[in-house]
Amino acid sequence: MSHNIDKIIYINLDRRNDRREEIEQELKTMNLFDKAERFQAIDRPGKGIVGCTYSHLEVLKYAKKNNWKNVLILEDDFTFLVNKETFETKLQEFFEANIPYDVCMISYHIQQEEPTKYPFLKKVIEAQTASGYIVHQDFYDKIIELYEYAAPILDETMHHWIYANDQIWKRLQPNANWYALETRCGKQQSGYSDNSDKYMECNF
């Protein structure tokens, strides 16, 4: 279990027991379950992406309320691509380097990146997919403010390509200490997506 992560929150709809069982098994296999807590996802039938965005917003508010130094947020379709020893090693490399960070993505689909002086880390300029990411407590307010702005507009317009949580955050990425581990430690599982209301084949 990584001592570098204060808390792990996994987001799961009440009606997706299948996903709950899968993510909880992932966490148990990785010896992370004792540090994890389930967040009851906000259910917006027919507007899954709206519920998703509000869920991420509420998780960040919850992390702030609990004064966690950081939080690893996982969606319930997250699956690890590495074993627990590799994951622990990659986290240890990152945290022992004492790199000032706002967000560190462990799962991602990157459109634009820059190299860093660290072989285990890349600087994110533009990336999406919010299935697995670590947020530092000093950055909670910044993302909370952004999501509080975007979520109502998303609900009204359904312009998800602009206002969904993993799209709107692209406004912050270039100028923030926003990183991704060079080793992609996880991805979204393929399966039925409540956000898209259809089967999704996921490769990232």
Across the structure, where does each feature detected by a protein language model lie?
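An acidic/histidine-cluster motif and surrounding catalytic segment
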Residues: M1-L74, F78-F204
